Amino acid sequence: MWRAGSMSAELGVGCALRAVNERVQQAVARRPRDLPAIQPRLVAVSKTKPADMVIEAYGHGQRTFGENYVQELLEKASNPKILSLCPEIKWHFIGHLQKQNVNKLMAVPNLFMLETVDSVKLADKVNSSWQRKGSPERLKVMVQINTSGEESKHGLPPSETIAIVEHINAKCPNLEFVGLMTIGSFGHDLSQGPNPDFQLLLSLREELCKKLNIPADQVELSMGMSADFQHAVEVGSTNVRIGSTIFGERDYSKKPTPDKCAADVKAPLEVAQEH
């Protein structure tokens, strides 16, 4: 049984990374032939982990890292050792982003992608903030969809997918829409068939591409975490977010203050974005 955190704890970050990458490639080989031939990206989720572990993973070839909290990402990405030793690092923000934290996120060094745009207002705020930053490149963004319909999870209803992508493409010239992201429900029993949340995201991409005349290989799917990344890749994920399987179990006693208001009723369940 593949248990999140066990491989890293026993063999170290380098061996854990190799094992995860091997499992990703095995899953790619099992994909249906009709899926877009996009090589999956491994996002190593380093939340609650020290900068030295990021540097260690970077030394073993990992380049893309993800964080859930703006303050932790800003501190880690600004760490002098990371800036010096990891010049090609790419940071993904994968947590819920409140509008009051947008400017802080845009200041993160080497920010590569925001995976969790979940409203038109947030897209507009990110667009204007990125413009003020003066970057020559557009910021890559994904739209987060609440495929499971759970109130505890953030993301747009599936029915609003096309409208927000149209808005980003037409009204947010500083953003580059690159895909759809979901967390989905946890603990799906694969003996009952494919994860319905993953299947829904696949169907949303198909509908989106058809209506907006976008090639399918230009719309990524970010789905799959430590517990289900192989299945996610098998059915079409192009971006898996894996943390404890690489870095070991997390110590949440050292977790920074979440980037949210006390009034945000979804906050206590935010750690469910796990990865």
Curated annotation (Swiss-Prot):
One of its GO terms (cellular component) is mitochondrion. Keywords: Disease variant, Epilepsy, Phosphoprotein, Pyridoxal phosphate. Pfam families: Ala_racemase_N. The modification Phosphotyrosine is found at Y69. GO terms for biological process: vitamin B6 metabolic process. The modification Phosphoserine is found at S6, S226, S244. This is Pyridoxal phosphate homeostasis protein. It comes from Homo sapiens (Human). The gene is PLPBP.
